[in-house]
């Protein structure tokens, strides 16, 4: 083995993906359109103003949507198949190359299930909403269909439309039902996310019109195109910015603490449980799958950014005195493992990244729901004002403790398995040099050590800190009610189930992950060909990699 600086040529990597398997029943179209059309009925529901009828209606629509996605998985999805399944294709605007193309593979099916599951629980979490309940549940249901569409559509232009349309409900949910600084948080959210989305549109148009002729934006077509390496690098950089905002990647993260700081509990659940996963999914779907030559050069940067996420966000979370912002920075830290896994070029590491997205979706939703439930009782988010509430809310303390242990990756919980897979996959795979792997693993371990420190100290301060007698005497601290216990219990079942038997989840996507990693490794081999192979073709221009020089790959002598 010898070290070689990443250098690529305008010769391209031509990967192929399996042909889609057509759906016998329009499961995915139904899962997208059912909640959207269901939301349109909400304004016409007779209601006395208390929102009771609307709540039950929204819960019914959300539960049926969840059952539709479960039916899609059980009836039409084969986990052993690598390629696209449940595929539906209808020509929509042929002159523009726009097609209604949906489908699911291992990259999308787990997140489709996660979306419908979290949304149903978010509706239950929104039960106390009394201010403009019709508009609130209308937005929740519309958001459900939009988020499923992001994971299910197989046309890049359609993906952009779903990505953009999903932003409006989030903006309104923040701007209308948020805290005192809700307008600032909502505006910052829309500026960051909508502004960065321009890169998705530009990349979609460039890739769809590549080569001239009739534009084609379908993923299966784009995956088999011979994009030049320079072209891939430009598209990859723009998409990394767009998806890095949503993940989020430091330093593109500043909208998230503000959004979480002002959001209500159900919106928290949708932000942490689903919205952030859109960024990780898109990095896998577009950057890693459609642009493999560029991914081979950007992957070391993803890993470095992942470490920065883990350490910076963990240190910042440690310093926060606001409960919502503390958990928000904890989310950013955990998403750093997704970046490391995506850049690992290891089936185990990439599988760990996928599992981390699902795991964090469940754990993040549970923690933010508890944040909302605690705030409803205490009317404060400052840790130093909550001391001693554990004596009056013992069940709430037990729920907080269990979910916090899941977040700090306690063995037997899903977070432990996903982070261990990312670490093991990255360290044991020999794509990168040993010194680089050791440095990255050592730095990432700092974040792992900090997580239990700030989470356990948070629990101690909230529930068993110095009692604030005036604070406790002026508040009726009611313990967790059955609805709240049910929501947390529903989230803990898969958290513990995956932690004890990870194959429940990993088998749903491992075939797709293996195929993706295999194609990306071929791109690395082509990128790191011996220099004499490059110089043999004098008509090809050299492009020096923009990745840091401290991250050389290891290749075998030919």
From Swiss-Prot:
**Membrane-crossing residues?**
25-45, 56-76, 111-131, 133-153, 157-177, 189-209, 230-250, 264-284, 298-318, 327-347, 353-373, 395-417, 438-458, 485-505
Q: Please give the superkingdom of this protein's source.
A: Bacteria
Mention any one GO cellular component term assigned to this protein in its UniProt record.
Answer: plasma membrane-derived thylakoid membrane
The Enzyme Commission number assigned here is 7.1.1.-
Q: Supply the gene name.
A: ndhD
Which molecular function term from Gene Ontology is one that the record holds? ubiquinone binding
What is the reaction catalyzed?
Answer: a plastoquinone + NADH + (n+1) H(+)(in) = a plastoquinol + NAD(+) + n H(+)(out); a plastoquinone + NADPH + (n+1) H(+)(in) = a plastoquinol + NADP(+) + n H(+)(out)
Keywords, sorted A to Z: Membrane, NAD, NADP, Plastoquinone, Quinone, Thylakoid, Translocase, Transmembrane, Transmembrane helix
Protein name listed in UniProt: NAD(P)H-quinone oxidoreductase chain 4
Q: Give the UniProt family note.
A: Belongs to the complex I subunit 4 family.
